[in-house]
Amino acid sequence: MRHYEIVFMVHPDQSEQVPGMIERYSGVITAANGTIHRLEDWGRRQLAYPIQDLHKAHYVLMNVEATAESIEELETAFRFNDAVLRNMVMRTKVAVTEASPMAKARDERDSRRSPSDDRIEEESAEENAE
């Protein structure tokens, strides 16, 4: 089996269906005795250029170890799913398991947020509720 990095972009109106899509596509990989090394849901992000008059899309990244047949099946599923705007499948030499730069930036941003910020937000939410 070979290692692949898969990124697909979903129509922003279909964002609530992304967990189901991830489960379905993960099932294709695992049904063929493949392994998912990394799975990251990046959420809605700004597009570099409009696609079908859209300016945002929901991004998902997967690093998998799979057979060529299961990757072909996955690409076919992407092609026939109208909610998938774009997809890219790249073969890699080794399994990538560490967090992507996108995930690292999000974790770093979350860690920089101090507990006092949370307390201030809770207090303002309580004031707004009254």
UniProtKB/Swiss-Prot annotation:
Compositionally biased region (Acidic residues): 119-130
InterPro entries: Ribosomal_bS6, Ribosomal_bS6_sf, Ribosomal_S6_plastid/chlpt, Transl_elong_EF1B/ribsomal_bS6
Any one cellular-component term (Gene Ontology): cytosolic small ribosomal subunit
Disordered as annotated region, ranges: 96-130
CDD domains noted in UniProt: bS6
A Pfam cross-reference name: Ribosomal_S6
Protein name (Swiss-Prot/TrEMBL): Small ribosomal subunit protein bS6
Annotated organism of origin: Shewanella denitrificans (strain OS217 / ATCC BAA-1090 / DSM 15013)
Top-level taxonomy: Bacteria, Pseudomonadati, Pseudomonadota, Gammaproteobacteria, Alteromonadales
